[in-house]
Each structure stands twice: as structure tokens, then as C-alpha cells.
Amino acid sequence: MRKLTMLLGLLISSFAAIGADMFNGADNFYKSDKVTQQKVTFKNQYQMNVTGNLFIPKGINQNAKNPAIVVGHPMGAVKEQSSNLYAQKLAEQGFVTLAIDLSFWGESEGKPGHLIAPEIYSDDFSAAVDYLSTQRYVDAEKIGVLGICGSGSFVISAAKIDPRMKAIATVSMYDMGSAARNGLNHTFTLEQRKALIKSAAEQRLVEFKGGEIAYIPGTVNKLDESTPAIQREFFDFYRTERGGYTPQGEKEALTTKPMLSSMGKFMNFYPFNDIETISPRPMLFITGDQAHSKEFSEDAYKRAGQPKELYIVPNAGHVDLYDRTDLIPFTKLTSFFKDNLK
């Protein structure tokens, strides 16, 4: 276990982040007075209940067909972290929006919690499209998707096989497959990757025999002098009043931490393969110029077919675009979806 901890620490510390004034403009728990909110539940194709927050602009004509957007939260987070903010801001611009909890996270179904399951995560977005398509005030031909952080890779995976997603946007995207296999900037060796896979397989057997579940470190619960910059960036969001949120029935210390035994599923996740087949549906990749995750948006943009756009936000890091309303380009997102969901 000590060797595993060292390997996971190396993976995390390979992610270099640039420090920023994290709290300036941060508004994760924003509450709009221009939209209504209701909790909804629907089933994915695995017959698992997916829970989301549905936001509808006040005064919208519910006898008309309106454009809609599904919003996905960062990996390890829940809908109350970042995605509710984006969903409300976009709903203020006239879209019906739906911020979902991915299966095994938050209020959505899935046992054991925090299981890594990218195929199911991707299906959750298609299930959200199913749900929106049945609402009388939504135009089923005008539904877009937006994925933040890890959900960026899940919406791309979903959009490749779901043409009902008419416009695809990502913000601070992580390719969760590449991040697990290679670390950032491909700093993880094949031997280290194999060691992690071996540890995950061994832990799977432990759990099969009734042993305790082990978790990938996720966001640290406290800082010390040795804490890597990337962890400090996430800590400033997930472990402070800025963005910290513990779903009912969960332990705060375990939030953001996926199950180790399911790690191999990310190793076998290649969301950018065949990304060009999404064309001619438009894609928008938003990243910060200081984001440690910028390589993933650049890679996706390079591989994607037309029409596509890479939009780089000046002076923004990865987590800045979770909640810093002074940096998040809501005007750009609004114009992208209005232009392509009409």
C-alpha cells in the first residue's frame, strides 16, 4: 500500500498548477432570481436513477419549443459544484438547463458510491437528452451539452454515438483516460501505469472478499509544505467554503475520492478516438491559458472535425473556470449555443 500511495502521489504531483487569486469573483453557490429550479429524476439505459436540477427561465413560453442544455460536473464533484452555476447562468439567457449528478455520485443511483464507470457516465448525458426530449417546452432538435473538467471527456464520448446532441462545449476539460494512463504532459511511465493497474486489480479482490473499500487520494483534506501545487488549487475549491459540498449521507473526508479498484476503467477510456466523427456538429473547447489541463483541450481541438473552436481565457487556471464569474466566458458560451441551437 505504501508503494501505491507513492505512485498515486507521483501521478498527482506531476500535475503542475499556477497559483492564482482563487477566491476573486468566485460564486459557486450562486442563486439566480431569474430562473426556477426543480429536482428531477430519470433512468439511464442501465435502469439507474439519475438525479438533476432542472432550471427554467422565468417567463418562458412553456407552450413553445425551447432550446436546452445538459451540464455535467467536474470529476469527483457533484452538481452543486460548478455545474449548477453554469446551468443557472445559461438559463438566464433563455435556455432550459439540466445539471446532473453522474451515476455513483451525489444523488444519482449507483452502489458502491464513487465507482469509476466512464461508459455509464457518458450514458447519463444521453439519458438527460432522453428526459429533456419528453418535456413539452423543449425542442428535441435543439439540445446541447456542456461538460466541465472530467465531464468534458464524458460528453465527447457520449456525443460520438448520440447525434441528438447538436452542440458540444467543454470547459477546463480533462481527458480522464489520458490523465490516468499518462499523467499530465505524459510524465507517467508505462511501468508506473502497470503498477497502478496491478494495485487496482488486487484491491478489487480484497473488496470481493468483503474487505474495506480503498479510495484514490482525490483532493487532500489538509495542506502541508509538501502539498503539490495542483492539490493546493483543488483544495482551495473543494476543501473551503468557496466550493466545498458534502452530499447527504456522505463523509466530507471522502468527497472527490474515486474507488481505487475501479481505476482500470479509466485506463481503458479513450474519448478522443474518432472525435472527428462528431462533425459537422459544432464543438467549443474552453480552457485557461494557465490551466494545467490545457493540453487536453488542445488535443481534442486538434483531432476534432469542423466546425470547431479553441477558446483560451487569459489569466485563468483550471479551477478558476469552475466558479470565477469574472473569468468564465458566459457570453461566449451563450453565443455558441444560441448560434447552434436555433
Predicted feature descriptions by range:
Residues 22-64, 322:
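N-terminal cap/lid segment of alpha/beta-hydrolase-fold proteins
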Residues 43-45, 79, 105-144, 323, ...:
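Catalytic nucleophile-loop/oxyanion-hole region of alpha/beta-hydrolase
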Residues 76-88, 102:
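The serine-hydrolase catalytic nucleophile loop
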Residues 89-109:
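Conserved alpha/beta-hydrolase
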Residues 156-240:
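Alpha/beta-hydrolase-fold enzymes
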Residues 278-279, 284-287:
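Short beta-strand/loop motif that positions the catalytic acidic residue
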Residues 304-319:
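Catalytic histidine neighborhood in serine/cysteine hydrolases
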Residues 316-319, 323-342:
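Catalytic active-site module of serine/aspartate enzymes centered on a nucleophile-bearing elbow/loop
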